[in-house]
């Protein structure tokens, strides 16, 4: 009864009885607070990788949910990780208002959107934002994979109110949150995002390639622009697909290596670096080794950046 009454009165977040003392302070901070929380629902790139070798970090593709205080949830990308987020949100039994930011429409960033159940629930409200590709709008990009042929349900079946918005390089503001966008170095139009809230900031930069010096695609001006975009961020979540050795045979594939990311994080003077979008051929042990390679690279640069490789379900708070 209390939940139904709260929803009818327009509440999107509330505390329910009985109060759980072990989580009360965290719940209250979230409800009233000036912090942001990022939850990782998928950290892999290219395609999901089930199996024993991916149990620790998880095998789902890109999806990160960011909560700023009591503002509507922001979801970044709709890879296979968004299915677990869907299950979590459905278990909350409350009306959902959220924004879904798409970096780009490659499959590992959009192909689980049709399985995001809250989109089909009347009373929920979503805005789906991302870069258009030529004359193709974000609405057309998202509906193309739900045309009744490749997937049996079309976007006309969405029960929630769903709005689409095309983005370029721009700044948007809502609920005391500022979101800035930047076009990244990746095939097609791929957007990076910087989220600012109450003096804190988090950058979501995937997919992206910076190239090594001497390679045809190396652009120092672009790298400096990206460092300026990320400068001083409390958290940088970024494409770190390859080790330096792996990158040598995969230059031009649209993804970054450990050394490239280490130099970016050090130049941008971010507080915390989170490795993301792991190559599907990398096992959990390989990611452990890549994390150690990153820590050593940062140390060689004299950087004090804290570095982690999040696992599915991990949360970071700032």
Residue ranges: model-predicted function:
Residues 1-13:
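Alpha4 helix (beta4-alpha4-beta5 surface) of REC/receiver domains from two-component response regulators
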Residues 19-28:
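C-terminal output helix
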Residues 33-206, 210-216, 226-227, 284-318:
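Binuclear metal-dependent hydrolase catalytic cores
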Residues 211-305:
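Cap/insert and terminal regions of metallo-dependent hydrolase folds
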């Amino acid at each position: 009864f209390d939940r139904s009454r709260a929803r009818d009165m327009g509440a999107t977040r509330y505390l329910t009885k009985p109060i759980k003392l072990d989580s009360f302070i965290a719940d209250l901070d979230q409800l009233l607070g000036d912090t942001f929380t990022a939850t990782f629902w998928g950290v892999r790139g290219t395609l999901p990788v089930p199996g024993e070798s991916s149990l620790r970090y998880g095998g789902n593709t890109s999806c990160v949910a960011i909560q700023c205080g009591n503002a509507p949830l922001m979801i970044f990308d709709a890879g296979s990780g968004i299915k677990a987020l869907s299950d979590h949100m459905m278990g909350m039994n409350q009306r959902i208002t959220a924004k879904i930011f798409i970096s780009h429409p490659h499959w590992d960033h959009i192909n689980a959107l049709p399985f995001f159940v809250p989109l089909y629930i009347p009373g929920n409200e979503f805005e789906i934002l991302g870069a258009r590709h030529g004359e193709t709008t974000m609405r057309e990009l998202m509906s193309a994979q739900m045309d009744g042929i490749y997937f049996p349900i079309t976007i006309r079946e969405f029960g929630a109110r769903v709005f689409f918005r095309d983005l370029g390089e721009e700044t948007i503001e809502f609920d005391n949150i500022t979101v800035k966008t930047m076009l990244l170095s990746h095939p097609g139009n791929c957007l990076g995002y910087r989220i600012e809230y109450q003096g804190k900031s988090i950058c979501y930069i995937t997919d992206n390639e910076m190239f090594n010096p001497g390679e045809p695609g190396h652009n120092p001006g672009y790298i400096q622009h990206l460092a300026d975009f990320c400068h001083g961020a409390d958290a940088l979540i970024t494409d770190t697909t390859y080790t330096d050795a792996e990158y040598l045979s995969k230059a031009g594939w649209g993804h970054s290596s450990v050394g490239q990311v280490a130099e970016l994080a050090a130049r941008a003077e971010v507080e915390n670096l989170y490795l993301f979008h792991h190559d599907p051929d990398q096992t959990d042990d390989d990611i452990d080794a890549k994390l150690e390679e990153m820590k050593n690279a940062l140390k060689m640069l004299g950087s004090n950046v804290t570095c982690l490789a999040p696992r599915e379900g991990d949360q970071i708070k700032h």
